Amino acid sequence: YLYAQQRRDGWRDALGEAGIAMRDAWRVNVNCLDYDAGAQAAAALMQLPAGEAPDAIFAVSDTLAVGVVNGLRGAGRRVPHDVAVVGFDDIALAAQIDPPLTTIAQPMRELGETAARLLLRRFADPRASVPGVLLPHRLVVRESG
C-alpha cells in the first residue's frame, strides 16, 4: 500500500529529526492492516530482548493500532504507562477504546473531494498530468500516547 509506505517514511523522518536511531527490529511488516495483524505485531515487538523493545509504537492505521493496544495488554504492558501507541486516520473507534487512541486525523471530506476532482479531470483529458496532492493532517492527542 502506497499510503502505508508514505506513513512509514514519515515515521522514519520523524525519528531522525528527533535524533532517535531507528532499529530494524522496530519495523514490523504485516500482510494486512487489520486488528489481528496489529495484535501480532505488538506481541512480536514485546518479545525483543530487554532494553530493545520500543516504548512507543506508531501504527499506519487506527485499526492496526487498536490491535496493538490489545496485543500489548496481552503481553502484560500498560498503554501508555509502558508503551505509548499512536494510530492514523481518526476512525470513530479511536475515541471509544480504552485508553482513547492518539491518532493523526486526515481531512476525509477534502480527501474525497480532491480525489473526485482529479478523477474527473483525468476523464476529461486522459493525457492530463495529475499532480500529487498532500492534504494537511492534524494530531489528535488522546490518552494512549
Language-model features, listed with the residues they occupy:
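Bacterial carbohydrate/catabolite-sensing allosteric modules
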Residues: 1-145
